[in-house]
Structure formats: structure tokens, C-alpha cells
């Protein structure tokens, strides 16, 4: 569903970012302004601030604003309900489970489903399961847009002084 997006937009769609103006601009580019109010991200401040300090929390500063925007865009394109996209009963979540099962096996089920700090359902995983998912992404990097988006734009994935960005830049 993201075929016609730029690499920057794809990178912010999988990011857990610092909330800088660069991150906010990329996340906002995913949605028409009329859909901005549908975002269910928590209110937040930029993680790292230089110069003039931001004191008013906004949804776009949330480290998951790009994920939320991309999911809303995908829901629109698929004709899914956009009002409840963060619920574990939403078609998006079932699609997410299928992607995880691609790496962990079709019969895999999480022991627990909870809500994370970004408002999304999150799954319980063992360290071995997480490693299998990351290994699967690396193994399929030539067939998967996620790897290319992250390596093309590591600063959008995390940002200044973030371990994920540093690792991507070092290994790329």
C-alpha cells in the first residue's frame, strides 16, 4: 500500500524518532491536513531539543507519529475504518500479526497482547522471537522496502544520538 511513497516517507513510517522538525515534516507529508486530527498518538515533546525550547506537547512530536500517519494512510487506501485503527480488533492489527507470522511461523501466537506507550497493541515476544524477526528482515532485505528505507534515511528512523541510527550508519 506504500508503493507510491518516497523513501523518506517509508522511513518515517517505520521510525521511532526524536520528534525534530525534519521528522514532523516527513510524518505530516503522509496525510492530507484534513486527516491530521484523526491521529491517535500521545501528546509529546521533541526528545532532543537545541536552541529554542518547545514547551507545548503535540501529537506530531510523538516518536510514533510517522507510524500512525502511515497506518491511517493505509487504512484509507484499503477502505478500513480509521476511527479505531489502534484496537487489536482492527484489520490493520490482523495484517500486522500475519507479517510477524511470516517470520515466526503461521501457527505462532503471542502469549500476551497489551497497549504500548504509543497507543498500539503490542505483542509479547521472547528474545529469540525478536532475533528471528530481525534476521528475517535482514535475510529478505532485497525483497522488502523496510530495509532499504531505513538504510537510505537512518536519521529519519531515530535521529541524533540514537542507537538505531548509529548502528545503521555504522553498518551501511
Give the role of each language-model region.
Residues 4-120, 125, 136:
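Active-site-adjacent helix/loop patches that line small-molecule binding or acyl-intermediate pockets
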Residues 1, 121-151:
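Active-site-proximal alpha-helical segments within enzyme catalytic domains
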Residues 144-172:
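Conserved SxxK-family serine transpeptidase/carboxypeptidase catalytic domain
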Residues 52, 56, 130, 157-158:
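Short secondary-structure transition/capping segments
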Amino acid at each position: 500500500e506504500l508503493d507510491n511513497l518516497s523513501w523518506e516517507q517509508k522511513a518515517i513510517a517505520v521510525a521511532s524518532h526524536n520528534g525534530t522538525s525534519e521528522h514532523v515534516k516527513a510524518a505530516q507529508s503522509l496525510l492530507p491536513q484534513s486527516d491530521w486530527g484523526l491521529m491517535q498518538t500521545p501528546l509529546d515533546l521533541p526528545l532532543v531539543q537545541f536552541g529554542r525550547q518547545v514547551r507545548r506537547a503535540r501529537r506530531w512530536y510523538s516518536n510514533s507519529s510517522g507510524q500512525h500517519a502511515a497506518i491511517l494512510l493505509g487504512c484509507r487506501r484499503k477502505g478500513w475504518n480509521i476511527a479505531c485503527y489502534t484496537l487489536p480488533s482492527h484489520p490493520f492489527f490482523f495484517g500486522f500479526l500475519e507479517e510477524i507470522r511470516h517470520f515466526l511461523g503461521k501457527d505462532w501466537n503471542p502469549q500476551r497482547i497489551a497497549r504500548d506507550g504509543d497507543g498500539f497493541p503490542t505483542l509479547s515476544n521472547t528474545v529469540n522471537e525478536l532475533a528471528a524477526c530481525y534476521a528475517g528482515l535482514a535475510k529478505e532485505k532485497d525483497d522488502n522496502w523496510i530495509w532499504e528505507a531505513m538504510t537510505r534515511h537512518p536519521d529519519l528512523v531515530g535521529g541524533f544520538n540514537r542507537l538505531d541510527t548509529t548502528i545503521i550508519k555504522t553498518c551501511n
